[in-house]
Amino acid sequence: MTKAEAYDKAWRLGRKGDFSLVDEIYHQNYKSIDYRTGIEANIEDDKVIVSTLGESVVFGPSKALFEGEDFVCVEGFAKRQLNVNDPSYGIMMTALSYQDGKIVSQKTVSSDLDFDPSEGKDWNWEDYE
């Protein structure tokens, strides 16, 4: 399994309450800063955030844009279903830095999309629910 695949699988399992792979691939010194708020988060904070998303967000397919020994960049799509009849869509890019083979920091940026990224593609949201 590549680093990008492990990252994707870890958080998909985490959304189901299984954080064993998250614990395996993250460094004990991991931290992330949300520059919008200035808040520093550790891996336990990230687990709480993922656990509270519930069914309101569906994460679609992701792919590695770059994968090296100490750095990985992953792109992924999300569908936010805050209103049953009015979903919104986004694209995210996550930069992962590694130390001793484990994720020591990450930064995610996202942008809203004004279209459904699954349209005309060989995947659908139901595959990821």
Over which residues does each language-model region extend?
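C-terminal and inter-domain tail/linker signature
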Residues: 1-129
